[in-house]
Amino acid sequence: MSDSVIRIKRYHYIHILDNNTNVTRTISGPVVYTRKEHETCLFDPCPCVSVPPRHYCVVKNPCVRDEAGEVVLESSGQVKLRLGDAEIRFEGEPFPLYPGEELDCRDGKGVQKLQLIPPNTGLHVRCVRDFKDADRLVGAGTEWMVAGPQTYIPRVEVVVVEEVKATVIYPNTALMVQANVNFTDRGGVPRVAGEKWLVRALGAYLQSVEETVLGLIQGTMLSDLKALRLSAVRSFTDVYGKGRRAGEQWQVTLKDAPVHIIDAYEMKVADVAAVSLSAKEYVIIHHPVDDTGHNRFGETLVRRGECTFFLQPGETMPRGVEQVLVVGKEEALLLEAVCEYRDRGEKRQPGSRWMVRGPLEYIPANEVKLLEHRRMMALDKNEGIYVMNTTTGEVRAVIGKPYMLDVNEVLWEKHLPLAVEELLESPNGSIQTSERNPGFVSHREKYRIVRFNVQHNAAVQIYDYRKKQPRIVLGPNLVMLAPHEEFTVLSLSGGTPKVPNSLQSLQLFLGPRFSSDTIVVETSDHARLRLRLSYNWYFDIDRVNPSQRTFSVPDFIGDCCKTIASRVRGAVASEDFDSFHRNSAKIIRTAVFGVDETGETKKNLRFTANDFVVTNIDVQSSEPTDEKTRDSLQKSVQLAIEITTKSQEAAARHGNELKDQEAKGQLERQKLLDKIEVENARTKWLELQAKSEAVQASGQSVAEAKARAEALLIEVRSEMQQAEMRARAYRISAEAELQKLQQRQALELEYTQRQNEIDVSKARAAAEAEAEKVKRMVDCIGRDTLVAIARAGPETQVKLLSSLGLKGYLITDGNSPVNLFGTAQGMIGEPKK
């Protein structure tokens, strides 16, 4: 400020610098100060620092004051400062800042409000410099809590760490606290650093600086049906005054307290629900707790209702609540003693077994183990089970009567090869090898007796490996396997050409049936042909006493086909192609069946090894194996047919032309004869004319009349003869044309008949193939399956109508209308007027 006269108001001040001594002094108003030449005013008059009530300010580098409160000056006259220190000043008279003093500003404000500590709140403060307070020395680092409600008076030596809210403890809750350092809490209990405890007093709890609040613990409500299972983290004495060891488990029930708050050294294991038993229920408790509170491991305890209880720690109910076993009249229980005890006066040894038969109610005892609940097994006359005696090991089959296993009997499972299991589930006991299911799983109950329906005109061989002898069962029949019997599985050739092991079957069809095979033969002129043969066969078996040799040939189909193929190849090899092509059927039948003593072809081929008889053989097709040869043969056949047809047409045409020429010759001859007769008639006419001229002399009129009459007669006769000649010529021409037409129609009819015969043979072959296909499909599907398919539609319709719940129904169509006029009135019972 450059003015020499400075007017300073009340509660204002300025700093004057003496340029001679370099000392700055403070001048407070109200005053009018005249500045000297060697003085400089550092700033315009500033207001003094005013601290209102409930406020404070912090002055840095405060001046030093004596006991009277006056400012202490240095020898140079400069105000003495406590550099680096600070001073907190509260409400009072406004004061100026001496040179070197600074006002600590926070958020742009030098004067701050005193902090108000509300109720249930405290300030966590820390001493940063030793000081003495009320004859008590407070060391640096000391922390304490200033609890509200009050106004916090700050000190330079103390800093506020944080504001702490009190935690409200409600009923059925507790506050878990942990000690940070060793100290004595408010209740006078010494605490160790890291120790945890619960504060259960209701209301607001303001923690001390030595404590850390871990959280509120909610109490668990207990009832008659709910208990709390706890475990001790360390050894301590619980709230009920009971000493607990580390790892020990116990339960708190409603008898102990309605609400339990888990203590600091308690860990909740689980909520335990009460087990309620009715009069018809019981439980088996494993490892029960005795009167001393210890588990009796390995023991069991049976408890029967009516009762309600809690499972103690260590006790288990593996099987849960069970119903009292009600044993019916047709039921029994298989029991086993696990230790020695007396049962109604009878001594039971460990491991002994017995059966308790109904009707009764049974609850197992601790000394008894229930092995099985057995029931009477109802068996039809065609049903059975396998039973094994566990004492002797004997296995027997029980068939056709209700049966209950005895004490020393068990159901015996008869295991069959997987292939036999799959054949048993197939419709007719046969299956193609290519159609086998690799993932097949049998659903047969192994203890049930094995049954198989032998079809009509079929046979099954069963081998008893204990007696080492087979038996044959002829169908229709039901086979039941004894415990030591097995099926004989047939592995037959199949397909065209025959492939070994293509078909597996449990039953042997006795026939008559047929088989087809394809073989390749070679004639003497090296023509290779593929023949498709079909033959009928059957087994000549005695149905009263069937022979075992029927099953002596495992693959009778393959053996038969090989034999026939060998004979056919040998016979064809001695014939040329043309001869074999013309007489193929006769050559093959003679080769297969052979000839008798008289040279006649036999009627069948018999295999004496298994009584297998082939009765007929048919050549279904014969074609060259070489494609070019086959095409050439077809072309030659077609060419032969065309040549034959054209030759017949030429012969017919030649005959017609010959007949036409003969008719024309006869016609020309007839014309010549007619001309001769005409000339003869003319000659006679001339003679008559001469006579008439002669008569003319006698009388012209008479002669003229007579001449005219004779001329007219002659003319009429000539015309009649000409008409007859024309009619005869027309008849001859018509007959020739008719013969020509008849010959043409005969040739066309013969050609049509040959075409029809070819078409009929093709249709017959197709029909036979289709019939064979249908027959094979029917054989594969089976009669029972076809009957089920035929019945499925009507049965489904009947079930559909039955499910509608109709008492009656009427089915009609538009051609037979039904008059329902007035039906509604009759249904509601109103009489018609």
From Swiss-Prot:
The keyword DNA-binding does not apply. GO terms for cellular component: cytoplasm; nucleus; ribonucleoprotein complex. MVP repeats lie at residues 54-118, 119-170, 171-223, 224-278, 280-328, 329-380, 381-433. It is found in: Cytoplasm; Nucleus. The keyword Repeat applies. Keywords: Cytoplasm, Nucleus, Phosphoprotein, Repeat, Ribonucleoprotein. Pfam families: MVP_shoulder (PF11978), Vault (PF01505), Vault_2 (PF17794), Vault_3 (PF17795), Vault_4 (PF17796). Its main location: cytoplasm. The vault ribonucleoprotein particle is a huge (400 A x 670 A) cage structure of 12.9 MDa. It consists of a dimer of half-vaults, with each half-vault comprising 39 identical major vault protein (MVP) chains, PARP4 and one or more vault RNAs (vRNAs). Required for normal vault structure. Vaults are multi-subunit structures that may act as scaffolds for proteins involved in signal transduction. Vaults may also play a role in nucleo-cytoplasmic transport. This is Major vault protein. It comes from Leishmania major.
